[in-house]
Amino acid sequence: MPKTVLVVDDDEHLREILSAMLRSSGYEISEAATGTEAVNKAISEKPDLILLDIELPDIKGPDVARAIRNNPASAHIPIIGCSAFFGWEYRKEALEAGMDDYLVKPISLEVIKTKIEEFILTER
């Protein structure tokens, strides 16, 4: 059974490109454009992994990660934060909020696929 990745990004174009690339690699994809939608889908759909943009219009990525971690139904799901912000303080904030990793955009498909496989293969 294919693994499911929840792609969370408010930029529709980036979300569609990333989703299409991951689909072509054999993943099932769910998408969310806001933090609220991401939390709801994480809890209801229980994807195998979440790719989470840090800057969302309603709830910032670290707060989304905290909400996902605080719900028993979704606390186990690996979360990879993605952002154009590259300072160490952003990475630190993401990891302290419960994200499992933090990648700086632009991110190559190979790096994303490697990270997804790393987390999915070492399921909690």
What do these predicted regions represent?
Residues 12-30:
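Two-component/phosphorelay signaling modules centered on CheY-like receiver
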